[in-house]
Amino acid sequence: MATVRSFDKPFELVDYTEELLIIPNTWGLLNELGVFEADGVAQHTITVEKIDQSLALLTDRVRGERNNMNKDYTRELHSFAIPHFPLDDYIKPEDVQGKRAYGSASAEEQLGMVRGRKLETIRRNHSVTLEAARMQAITAGTIYAPNNTVSVDWYASFGITRKEVDFLLGTGTTDVIAKGEEIIADIQDNVLNGDIVTGIVALCSPEFFSKLIAQAGVKEAYKYYASTQDPSRQRLGSGLYREFDHGGIRYIEYRGKYNGTPLIPADDAYFLPLGVNDMFKTYFSPANKFSFVNTNGEEAYVFEYPGDRDEEIVLQSESNFINMLRRPQVVVRGYTSN
């Protein structure tokens, strides 16, 4: 637990990171599904070694002639910088002086209550940024850094072309299960390491999901699923997401937006495996403070220190993360062109 700053030591910096991380991250479907594993690293770059093993059928040889030769792994090293996301806030005397406490008819506002509300807002801003960044990694295959301080395309970095499947949901004769089977087979073939896939999830735009459940070959199945599971259509979490299990795939409607722009483009759906270790990874690097040099990174940090002339208290926060698709080939883009 951080020690509250003593005003007898006006230049002391107080670490409120622990208090910040106690506030739960309740934002986002990707967080709820646990798609990304998290790992703290001690540097502001990550180095990834790509190892390819080629298998070959052996040919028969005449005894005594030169034998078949085994091929070793091929290795490639890739280094990626971790973007920096700072966020500051301030507590001013007028935030406390003469103010009524929230939810009270007469009690005066307290500094601790103001600080708590600001910490909660800071936490949510970092959480929503992380969710949007993870979704960008899935939909675009790139890292989130809107000011281009860092630029990484996971498909280009690993020389991979993303598989795409047109579901043609506007065509009544489309075999949706066959489309799904094509995607399932492709994902299983590209997992490569022998891990067992516990499920395939499709994160769908509202447009894709609505067309899916209205498609002639799916409509009756969805009616049956909805009526047996939940009369109001089964929804996840806070009730924002409709879901539908069909043909071995769990289709989930994702309605996340930022400034009116959907995080999943209209008519798109993104298919990915669940239960596979180290498939999707978020790396957190340490805060830009001397006391955190060469320490493993946390999800976010916040520090408090006095401002100029005793007129404000500064809350300085930051997060440093990169969302990596360790095997970008297992994310399949589905879409409907009609």
Question: What would you call each of these model-derived segments?
Answer:
Residues 1-45, 324-338:
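N-terminal alpha-helical "arm" segments
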Residues 34-101:
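Assembly/oligomerization interface modules of large self-assembling protein complexes
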Residues 85-160, 175, 179, 185-210, ...:
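Long, contiguous amphipathic alpha-helices that act as assembly "spine/axial" helices in icosahedral shell
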Residues 166-262:
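A contiguous, surface-oriented mixed alpha/beta subdomain in the mid-to-C-terminal portion of proteins
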Residues 219-338:
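Sequence/fold signature of self-assembling virion shell proteins
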